[in-house]
Each structure stands twice: as structure tokens, then as C-alpha cells.
């Protein structure tokens, strides 16, 4: 018999996420789309990582920032308070990619709109994938919160 460990999301589900203002909207193209080579690397990697959602059709998205994250995100200083920080809302897929902070360090989670943890539903939803991109693109991401 084989057993595995399901770690789940590190960031908690942000119960009031729908009240956070949308700071940016766009779309992740479907898997059949050609990605422009002129886009920033983090955008291309995000598209490649999540173009499978909604049966390969991609998804519209909204970026939402909590009230406590707006100042540090705008200042790009990395001084996020503990708690909920940001959500990338995949509207067509009804999925939330969540960033929160604990002791100044980013925590990541993936949830359905209903709060169900989806971090084990696909390899690209694992926390280590979030951490790799969010820490690997310092031109776009500061302390785990990325901007366009």
C-alpha cells in the first residue's frame, strides 16, 4: 500500500475576499493560445502554468488586495502585516489563489469560492509552485505579492 502526505494550503481562506477592491483584471489564455514573446517572463510563466483551467479554455481573472496590503503593495517595500494580503481570482474557474503573511513571510493557498482547499487538485496548485514563481521574479514580486 502506498501512502502520501497532503499538506494543503498554508494560507487560510480569506472569508471577506469578495469585499476587497479589484486592482487589476485580465485573462489567462487557453492552452491552444500562442503566448506573445514580448510579455514579461512572469506573465508568460503564469499563463503556461494555469492555461489548463476551465478545461484548457483559460480564465478571466481579478487581482484583489486586502485593505492592509494596499499600502505595502503600492510602496513595494515588502512590509506586509500578518494576515490576508492578496487574491488572484480565476473567475471562470471559480478558484482563488491566495497570498497571506505570517511573521513577515508569504503563505500560499488555493481555494474554491466555497472555501474548499484545492491545493491538491492539480500539480500547479501546490504551494511549492506558488513559492517558486513568487520568489523567482523579484522584478514583479515583493514579499510574495506580485504586480503586473
Describe every region a protein language model picked out:
Residues 4-61:
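General detector of N-terminal leader/presequence modules that precede the first folded domain
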Residues 6-30, 72-148:
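Sequence context surrounding c-type heme c attachment/ligation sites in exported
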Residues 54, 65, 115-117:
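Generic alpha-helical secondary structure signal
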Residues 57-72:
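Short, structured beta-strand/loop micro-motifs enriched in basic residues and often containing a Trp
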Amino acid at each position: 500500500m502506498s501512502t502520501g502526505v497532503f499538506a494543503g494550503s498554508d494560507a487560510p481562506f480569506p472569508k471577506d475576499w469578495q469585499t476587497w477592491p479589484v486592482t487589476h483584471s485580465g485573462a489567462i489564455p487557453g492552452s491552444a493560445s500562442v503566448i506573445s514573446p514580448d510579455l514579461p517572463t512572469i506573465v508568460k510563466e503564469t499563463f503556461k502554468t494555469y492555461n489548463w483551467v476551465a478545461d484548457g479554455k483559460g480564465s478571466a481573472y481579478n487581482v484583489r488586495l486586502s485593505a492592509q496590503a494596499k499600502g505595502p503593495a503600492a510602496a513595494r517595500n515588502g512590509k506586509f502585516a500578518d494576515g490576508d494580503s492578496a487574491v488572484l481570482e480565476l473567475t471562470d474557474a471559480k478558484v482563488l489563489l491566495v497570498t497571506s503573511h505570517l511573521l513577515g513571510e508569504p503563505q500560499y493557498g488555493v481555494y474554491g469560492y466555497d472555501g474548499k482547499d484545492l491545493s491538491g487538485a492539480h500539480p500547479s496548485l501546490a504551494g511549492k509552485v506558488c513559492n517558486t514563481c513568487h520568489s523567482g521574479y523579484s522584478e514583479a514580486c515583493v514579499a510574495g505579492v506580485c504586480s503586473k
